[in-house]
Structure formats: structure tokens, C-alpha cells
Amino acid sequence: MTTTIPLKEAVVVILDIGLGMTSKDSDGTTTTTSSIEDALRSVTLLYQQKLIYGKKDQLGLVLIGTKGTKNNLQDDGYQHITVVSDIEEPSIETLKYLENLAPGESKGDVIDSLIVAMDMLIRKTENKKYQKRIFLVTNARDPINTEDLSIVRDQFKKIDVKLNIIGVDFLEEIEENNMDTSNNNKNKSLKEKNEIFLREFAESVDGVLVPVKQALEMMSFFRSQSVMTRTSFRGALEITPELKIPVWGYLKMKQQLLPSLKKISSIAQQQIEQQQQQQQQQNKNKNNEDNEDNEEGKPNITLDVNQEVSYYSITDPDNEILKPDLLKGYKYGKSLIPFSKIDEDQLKYSSSKCLKVVGFTDRKSIPIYYNMGNTEVFVSQPGDKQSEEALSSFIHALVETDQVMVVRYVKTMNGSPYLGYMIPHVKSDYVCLYYNHLPLADDIRQYQFPPISPKNPLTRKSNIPNAEQLEATQQLIDSMDLMKSEFDEDGDPIQMLKPRFTYNPLLQHFYQCLHHRSLHPNTQIPKLDPIIAEYINPDQIIMNKSKQSIKNFADKFPLTKTTVFSKTPAISGGNTNGTTSNTNNTMIGGVKYHWKDGMLIGEEINLDSYVTDDGSEAKKRKVNDFSEFSLDKLVSGYVTEVGTINPVQNFKDMLNRRDMDLVDKAITLMKERILQLVNDSLRDQYYQKAFECIKELRVGCIRESEAEQFNGFLKDMRSLFQSKKRDDFWQYITADVTSILGEKSINLITQDECDSSEVTQEELDQFLDKKVKQFNPPPITNVNTDSVDDLFDQIE
């Protein structure tokens, strides 16, 4: 299986609008305006396809037969040729220009336009990787200068330019005896001579000439967007630790969604429209006869919008909450459980990239509904003969045994692991493995349906079809068989609705509407295209073929209309029939009906539970009054402990309490929590969290003028951890980590930072290098159970 990387394409479109597009032929007949209309439509469709599918392609537009001249070679005699747009990304402005384009007033030479187009391609693609192509759209009614033709041919081959000629009013085929210009040359018209010449020229440069009607049909067909072929995985397929096969993975199937909508400024749009109107008025005043673009008048206003989000508390809407002060909360019952960034990082599972075989199973043991997510295809590493042979033999063995392999798949380093399965696929020219995710028990929806199989003893007899019904069903299936609905030229059946040839009608209709809206912003969306309508409606060939089978099936399975119950509630007193209905059930005369196992079940309802003793009003369920509570009070207002889930926020909330003084308690609890995090940490698991707590404790002590409490605690930690079991934590918080974490090391609070501190700058500089005596830390309460109890306290 070979993979090709599509290159960017540089295209020059040459459109003939000269006098020949509307002139009289030599036989006296007058060509209709459909010639130039077909030419414009073909160029418009080409631009439209490039706008939709060719995201990286660039186009230029050249006109032949204009009254004026505008090109880089005009000083050398290339007259009546106008370059409307250089080779650039296609734009809506070019489409609008084409829509309002009028026929030219002069005659231009086709060969001269090809030379101008090649000059544009050379200037654009010099030292760049581009595929180069020229589209020439003409009816060949104007004279063509054939001098120096060999030089033009050589230049085409030298710069490797592909030529596509779209012939307006060209014959689909020309007989060989008519291709010779020497035969009956006098009897041929100028158009016939030019048509023969262009066919020969296109063939000499390996180009293609297509009549305009055929070109319109091809460009009107649906097509899919070209995408860059990139590997999604490069690594080894590990069958055993001793057997590893290098493979490459590619994305094979992914749902194509509609393009995402972006918000734009309506105010800026109005300003652009005003500028465009002013520019049009200026062009009229200048009488711009050559249809040249005025670059100075183009709007310089952008429609893009920058979106900024601000957060405010419901109870304190005047103060903005900064993003660093926000954290995520997960709903657990009726409570919100806050999770800090550190907690989220701890929840993530880190794994190395791998594609490891877990085991093998029969292919029939994996139902079709187990396919999840996108499909990937795996092939052997290109150029590695040993891996090709090993993978090929392995795939053929899976096919012979009708088995698939279950694998553990981690696409990238530290990525999420997936359980999936790989199916072998063998073709005449390549072999590969297709991969899909396997669902877990949480992903599968289990539903209970009433049995309808004739072989099931629990099936009701009324649900078992008879022989005639089974025969009618089989005939209906056979008549609508997509494998036998169409036939090729040899009479062999062809499968209908192949996914590779069936395009999404929603996407196609969207792009047509998008194109229409870009050119006509104030008109209605166009009606559904007939070709798209064929996609969304049943195929007429199949429907005609199965018409009798559908009738027989309807006769064998007659449908009876069910009783339609009134939707007027009986308890409202407005319905004398005593019936009520809602979405899921129906009540008639005090009996509530609902569907169960395909049957309508009735259940008697006691209306006393719905009305008061006097029958005046329905009872209302009592609801607890939570008007005095708010989310802020729930998660912060009544905090009296520094927990393990979010100790930093708990500490802040306790310091901010105004109904009681909890400063001393908050500092004491924070000290205990820091020591607990360090002692309970598996290696450095909680070091960062403890580090954040120490930083916040230091800030809080400075704020509350409790510098001595922090300085004493820091000295106690040095005695406890330095040069001991947790010396790595002491080095973690006191090392110069500015270049790594962007944070300064933890140190004492000095007199310059807080008036209550007695630490001088000299003592600060000596502190981290000073050795101290052994210190016994204060006892930590509920070290083993505090985190669990604290979690339940938060939930309650």
C-alpha cells in the first residue's frame, strides 16, 4: 500500500472574453450568449471547488480580449491580455468580479496568454514545491499566432506545467482524417482550424482538452476534500517481547462535520459595506473601462472578533474573579467537590507509546456495533523488507484462522491507553490491519426488548409470522438488494451506494448555500439541488423494481389505527370524558395507561393523592427553603478546617472569615496539613502541593502580621527534614528553582516584609546554610484518617 502526499497547486485560469465569444461564424450563424455563459460558469465552478476543497491551492486569473492591457510582458507586445489577480489564495472578491464580468471588446491571442500565464507561474513557484497547471477556457474563434510554437512547447515541458483546455462549442471527437489541416484546409472555418490546432498542441504537451459541457458535468459532481496524508502512529507492533514489527498507522475513517461557525462583528460588516459602496461610486466616476482592481480602495476592516470572558460571584458581582482564583468542581450528589490543578494532574495516567497485542479471538465474537470512534489502518514500515514479510505472513495467518487480535494502543507518549482490536485485510496489491476501539462495559447501552423470534419459547403467538408473511418479507428484501440493483456493460451486478462514491448531501448543500450567500448576501438560500435530492430520496430504480413487493408486504402486514386519546387533563375539570394524556402515558376514567413490553397496560390511579380535601387545588410537594444559601457560602463561607482536597483555598477562606477570628486556628491547621502531605507523600507525589501550601502560609502570615509563627515553623521543618529521610523535600522548597518552576525558594520573613518580624537580611542570608539541632515536630492529629473524614465533611 503506497501513500502519496498531495502537493500544493499553483493554477492560472485563462478566460477568453474576446469578440470571438459573441461573433458570427463564417457560415452566417450567430452564436448565442450561452458560449460566454458556459465559460464563466466553468471558471466559477473551478474557483468554487478550490475554495472548498483546495485549501492550500493558489489561483490566478487572466482575461483574453480586454480593451486594455495589464500584464508583466505588455512591453513586449502581449496586448489585450489583462491579469485580474496574481497567483494567490482564491477569494470571494474574484467570484464577485466574475459574476459582473462583461464581454470584451477586442481580440487576444491564446498563445500569448499561455506565455503570460507561464511567466506568472515561474515568478510564483521559483524555488518552491508546487504543482503547476494552466486552465484555458476559449471557443477558439479569434486568430491564433503559431509562430515560435516549438519554444512554447519546450517551455511547458521544462517547467513541468499541466495544460487543461476547456473548449466552448467544441466537438466531443474529431475524425482522424479531419485532424490533418492540409486536407480540405480551404473548406474549414477559422474555428475548426483553431480547434484542430489546440487539440494537437494539448497532446504535444501531455495536456487534456475537454468540451465545456463535459467539464461542467465533471465539476458539478460531488467530491471529497483532499487531505494531507500523515501518519498517526509510528512504532512497533509488539506481538511478544521478542517479536516486534515496525508499522506505520494512518487515519482511515473519520466523520466529516460541517465547518465550525465563527462569530463576526455586524458593526464591522456595515462599515465594510459602506466602504464598498463608496469604492463602487469612485470607480464609476473614474470610468474604469478595463475592469481593473483598485487596490487602494479595498476595505481594511476585519470582521474577526476577540472574545474575553470575565468571572463574577453571584453574591459579590462588583468584584471580578481572576482566572488563577478559579478551580474546577465536580458534582457528587448534591455537592460540588473542588479539584485543584495538582489534583487533576495526579488523576492523569501516564504511559509510554505502544501497540501491544493482548490476545487473539474469533472474528465472530466481536459484534459490528463494537466499532467505536475512528478507524485507523496499519501497514509495514515503508522500505523495510523484513517488516513487510513478517506483517504479511502474520496478516495471512489471521485470515486463514478467521481471527482478530486484541491490542493495547497508546498513540503518543503519556497518551490515554485504549483497548482495541485489529482486523486483517488482504488485497491483491497490499495487505494491512484495520484498528477500532473496543467499548467497555460503561460504553454499552443495555436494553430489554420483548422477544419476537419464532424460536424463542417466550414469544407471544400473536407476534410469530406465518409462512406467507415470511415469504413476502423475503421477496421485499430481495427486490431491494443493493448488490443486484445495477449492472455494468457486461451485465454483471454492481453494488449501489458504495461509501467511496456516496457523498454527504448535507455537506454538498451547505457548500452550495455558502457559495450563494457569499455572492448574494441579501437573497434567500437556494432551493435543494435536484442532484442532492436524488441522494436523500430512495432510488427510483429500486423503488420501481420493488413496488409490487412493497404492496404484497403491506397486504400481509395490515396496519390498524390505534385509539387516539384526548390530551385534556381530567383533573382540570374541563373534560367530561375523564381522559388525560401526556408524552409517556394516558389516563382514561381514572385509569393510567402506559406501554410495557409492546402492550398497553392499565393501572388504576387514586386521585386523592393529587387533589385537596375540598377538590379545589392540587397539592404541592414541600420544598426546602435554600434562599439563604449560596454557592460561595457552601464552598467557602463556613469553612472551619484546612482539608486535604484544597488546603490552599480552605486556608484563604478561614483567614477571610469576618464573623469570627480563625487566624491562629488556620495557621496551626495549615502547619499540620503541610507536615501530613510531606509524610504521606509517595516519593515526591505531594511535594508540589505542600510547596503551594507553604507559599500561601507565608503570604497569610505576612498579611496577618504573624511572621514569627511562619519563621518558627520553617526552622522546625529544617530540623525535621534537612539531612534526613525527607531531605529531598527540604532541597525542593529551598533550592533556587526560579529557572525551572518560575518560583523563588522559600525563606524566612524579614523585617522589610513584615513589621512583626525580627529577622534581618544578614540572618536571612545565613539561614539556609546553617545547621540546627534535632527537633521534635508537633503532633499531627488524625494523620491516617483525616483526609477521608475531611472528604465526607466536605460532601455533607
UniProtKB/Swiss-Prot annotation:
GO CC, sorted alphabetically, is: chromatin; Ku70:Ku80 complex; nucleus
Predominant location of this chain? nucleus
Q: Which is an annotated Pfam family here?
A: Ku_C
Q: Where in the cell is it found?
A: Nucleus
Signal peptide, first to last residue: none
Q: Which InterPro entries match?
A: Ku70/Ku80_beta-barrel_dom, Ku80, Ku_C, Ku_C_sf, Ku_N, Ku_PK_bind, SPOC-like_C_dom_sf, vWFA_dom_sf
**Annotated segments matching region Disordered:** 272-302
Q: Could you say which enzyme class this protein belongs to?
A: hydrolase
Limits of the Ku domain: 240-471
Q: Determine the domain of life of the protein's source.
A: Eukaryota
Q: Which GO terms describe its biological process?
A: DNA damage response; DNA recombination; double-strand break repair; double-strand break repair via nonhomologous end joining; sorocarp development; telomere maintenance
Domains: what does the record tell us? Answer: The VWFA domain interacts with the KBM (Ku-binding motif) found in a number of DNA repair proteins. The N-terminal and C-terminal regions are not required for binding to DNA or for degradation of the protein with only the central region being required for these processes.
Function per UniProt: Single-stranded DNA-dependent ATP-dependent helicase that plays a key role in DNA non-homologous end joining (NHEJ).
Kindly give the PANTHER family that the UniProt entry links to this protein.
KU AUTOANTIGEN DNA HELICASE (PTHR12604), X-RAY REPAIR CROSS-COMPLEMENTING PROTEIN 5 (PTHR12604:SF4)
Question: What is said about its interaction partners and assembly?
Answer: Heterodimer of ku70 and ku80.
The entry assigns this protein to a family as follows: Belongs to the ku80 family.
Name by which UniProt lists this protein: X-ray repair cross-complementing protein 5
Species whose genome carries this gene: Dictyostelium discoideum (Social amoeba)
- Per UniProt, what is the name of the gene that codes for the protein in this document? ku80
